Amino acid sequence: MTESKNSFNAKSTLEVGDKSYDYFALSAVPGMEKLPYSLKVLGENLLRTEDGANITNEHIEAIANWDASSDPSIEIQFTPARVLMQDFTGVPCVVDLATMREAVAALGGDPNDVNPLNPAEMVIDHSVIVEAFGRPDALAKNVEIEYERNEERYQFLRWGSESFSNFRVVPPGTGIVHQVNIEYLARVVFDNEGLAYPDTCIGTDSHTTMENGLGILGWGVGGIEAEAAMLGQPVSMLIPRVVGFKLTGEIPVGVTATDVVLTITEMLRDHGVVQKFVEFYGSGVKAVPLANRATIGNMSPEFGSTCAMFPIDEETTKYLRLTGRPEEQVALVEAYAKAQGMWLDEDTVEAEYSEYLELDLSTVVPSIAGPKRPQDRILLSEAKEQFRKDLPTYTDDAVSVDTSIPATRMVNEGGGQPEGGVEADNYNASWAGSGESLATGAEGRPSKPVTVASPQGGEYTIDHGMVAIASITSCTNTSNPSVMIGAGLIARKAAEKGLKSKPWVKTICAPGSQVVDGYYQRADLWKDLEAMGFYLSGFGCTTCIGNSGPLPEEISAAINEHDLTATAVLSGNRNFEGRISPDVKMNYLASPIMVIAYAIAGTMDFDFENEALGQDQDGNDVFLKDIWPSTEEIEDTIQQAISRELYEADYADVFKGDKQWQELDVPTGDTFEWDENSTYIRKAPYFDGMPVEPVAVTDIQGARVLAKLGDSVTTDHISPASSIKPGTPAAQYLDEHGVERHDYNSLGSRRGNHEVMMRGTFANIRLQNQLVDIAGGYTRDFTQEGAPQAFIYDASVNYKAAGIPLVVLGGKEYGTGSSRDWAAKGTNLLGIRAVITESFERIHRSNLIGMGVVPLQFPAGESHESLGLDGTETFDITGLTALNEGETPKTVKVTATKENGDVVEFDAVVRIDTPGEADYYRHGGILQYVLRQMAASSK
């Protein structure tokens, strides 16, 4: 770490017990004491990293003199203490670092200079797919298949962990990255050779903000920005506006943390918090347990905010002790927070905020969200009514969705069973079909009853609204003890009443850490969950990222052959179209407790207040209220089942891994030996032929529109992580390289191979490109006579051959969702030079710049619709060359020429927001910028 210039004489000594620590005292700078918590963390960061060039005393004073009412205008350089990764985004990061070692050497530098300068940690959690479910050996089967499919990736990651210094990998089967982070990896306060400072962490997953619940400032970034941070580059940002969110009251009986977070998500989305910090304060904060704070922080990307911070207080240190942190570390956290004015207690002076919201927690009511956005909250009491309102949208054929996948499918096509893989008895015969029907009570809604014969015997009738997947999944909820214990207890009560999950429901339980398995065993809850079909499926993200695996063959066939509108209910954070399963059209977020309830109901067309879930052994109707666990029951079970010893035991050898991990055949050497025949790991192309000096920025002439899209296009739409559909360009590539269909794996697992990923860009089966009438990865190819329909990738190849640049037109909230760098990498590799939208989500906008694609916005109040653009025009964009003179133009002129010669002109806003971003764009991307800096410094 470079020594700070310390121009404010802020370096001081902190005594904690019998130890002394150096630290940079905020009290040395007038004004710091009145700042919101999150800005105090930024202020300390600048004090500690002040170098007189990139970070000056003027920057420090700008933080101290922050004007809560002003719009962001002052750029600062934030240096995170560490970087966190998961394997889907982490594999391409390691690929890029390995490629950079070779590129540095080619530019005359030392390849061994390419190492993370700050701790970089990866948790492998994105690769497990739920093939087996509802059976005692589901976990073992899914792990076995995971290693078979991902052996090459895992060998590569082990090579990286042994080749790069300051880089550690938590093996698969341990848990979800964000839960492992808050339970083990997070420091809260760093001790770096006697220097104490706040733990700050950026991550290659948007839900990195879960750590905000621990008082750790951090957020999700694209993999390319994370790589730059690992290599010592600070994160360029504007001092943000901070939204103060006041919490009062206490959560009422019968309301879960999930209900609270869905309520907050709706409020903040309605308010508008993109590119803002959110900070929770008020008397209600102390009543929010740490696990609930983490759940709220986790959903920051769904709010749209950069982060969602809670301060450090007694609840924080209580959690650190529970999770096995050393007492010396806990003492440092408390002493440091108090010394810096970062500790919350009754004497804390309320900070000033840019904007204010307030929620009385006692007013929160049971809720779910869906069917396609996390912010679309629905009161549980109105869920049936709202489902019936939404259903016609999904049953009419206004937009044709390409569902030409055969009903009997291979596993990696998103349905059916793998050849030679998991057997057909995926769910327990004890809860097989016995004549149950969803056609009953269908009056008043679209209905298309289909009778299905169960392989286990019997038959049942499914219909629109069937719950095809009920999944306890995701970092948001699956290690929150209150809702996880609650799920086990509602299963127990349901089993006691003789209730069962419906036979058409795929039941999944994938906890966020092994600690959950431990307290389920202690509380003897597994037998009750298993009675509902919820066997342990894996420790990883599973359903929430689209790794729900295939539905049983007969159910998948019935859904697709009869075009049924199936639903999924998951305890996740995202429910975007096409994300959860290709067989499912409507996705709902709910607490783990409600996941169990919906599995029993079997349909979204259900009124939990007035309809019985079934009958008990005496023939009495059983309602949700009859099996809902009380707060006292949940708390008593938590006290009995959860202890510090559980955490200490599970994390004692967290980097060791299981026998399969330890026995992997790992390559050696400082540089990686690329295999040109590999379909998983390929040398990245971004530095091929890169000159020592950047090429001048040019305007864009004669561009064609590759895709014309609407509002809320997600990074899932742009770069899906889920299954690879046969016949698509990505599948054709794998076919040509000898990969069998049952070994396709997911697009997310292939992110180390740019050839697969560029073919999978804009390939989501639900993508609605307005240039064509069919949903999926299609466009019109204007290089061909009559501009016929073509795969987006195939058309891009023709455009490249013809020397024609490309643009994408979009609507509001373009790039919402995951911090998926491949959504920008794929955009770049397809030849797209500019994306023009009404608004961008923060991470994707930054990622586009990081890949040399310019983000542009239509003039305020305008859109491609209002301007009459239909996507058949030729585009010229002028004014970008001003960047060569060191200036970032506020707007550029866009001229769209229609086929009949008519012209539409407008001034597009250039969304290159900071000088640092302008530097990255001038160099063709952030990695090219970093590479040139490294090569120059090592000569």
From Swiss-Prot:
Disruption phenotype: Cells lacking this gene are glutamate auxotrophic in glucose minimal medium, show a strong growth defect, and secret large amounts of acetate. Deletion causes a strong selection pressure for secondary mutations within the gltA gene, which might be caused by a growth-inhibitory level of cytoplasmic citrate. Pathway: Carbohydrate metabolism; tricarboxylic acid cycle; isocitrate from oxaloacetate: step 2/2; Organic acid metabolism; propanoate degradation. It catalyses: citrate = D-threo-isocitrate; (2S,3R)-3-hydroxybutane-1,2,3-tricarboxylate = 2-methyl-cis-aconitate + H2O. Optimum temperature is 50 degrees Celsius. It is an enzyme of class 4 (lyase). Signal peptide: none annotated. One of its GO terms (molecular function) is 2-methylisocitrate dehydratase activity. Optimum pH is between 7.5 and 7.75. It holds the Pfam family Aconitase_C. Keywords: Iron, Iron-sulfur, Lyase, Metal-binding, RNA-binding, Tricarboxylic acid cycle. GO terms for biological process: propionate metabolic process, methylcitrate cycle; tricarboxylic acid cycle. The keyword RNA-binding applies. Coiled coil: none annotated. Induction: Repressed by AcnR, RipA, GlxR and activated by RamA. Repression by RipA is part of iron homeostasis and serves to reduce the iron demand under iron limitation. The activation of acn transcription by RamA serves to allow the increased carbon flux through the TCA cycle during growth on acetate. GlxR is a global regulator that binds to the acn promoter and presumably represses its transcription in the presence of cyclic AMP (cAMP). InterPro entries: AcnA_IRP_Swivel, Acnase/IPM_dHydase_lsu_aba_1/3, Acoase/IPM_deHydtase_lsu_aba, Aconitase/3IPM_dehydase_swvl, Aconitase/IRP2, Aconitase_4Fe-4S_BS, Aconitase_4Fe-4S_dom, AconitaseA/IPMdHydase_ssu_swvl. Its cofactor is [4Fe-4S] cluster. [4Fe-4S] cluster binds at C475, C541, C544. It comes from the Bacteria. Its EC number is 4.2.1.3, 4.2.1.99. Residues 433-453 are annotated as: Disordered. PROSITE patterns: ACONITASE_1, ACONITASE_2. Binds 1 [4Fe-4S] cluster per subunit. Belongs to the aconitase/IPM isomerase family. Involved in the catabolism of short chain fatty acids (SCFA) via the tricarboxylic acid (TCA)(acetyl degradation route) and probably via the 2-methylcitrate cycle I (propionate degradation route). Catalyzes the reversible isomerization of citrate to isocitrate via cis-aconitate. Could catalyze the hydration of 2-methyl-cis-aconitate to yield (2R,3S)-2-methylisocitrate. The apo form of AcnA functions as a RNA-binding regulatory protein. Monomer. This is Aconitate hydratase A. It comes from Corynebacterium glutamicum (strain ATCC 13032 / DSM 20300 / JCM 1318 / BCRC 11384 / CCUG 27702 / LMG 3730 / NBRC 12168 / NCIMB 10025 / NRRL B-2784 / 534). The gene is acn.
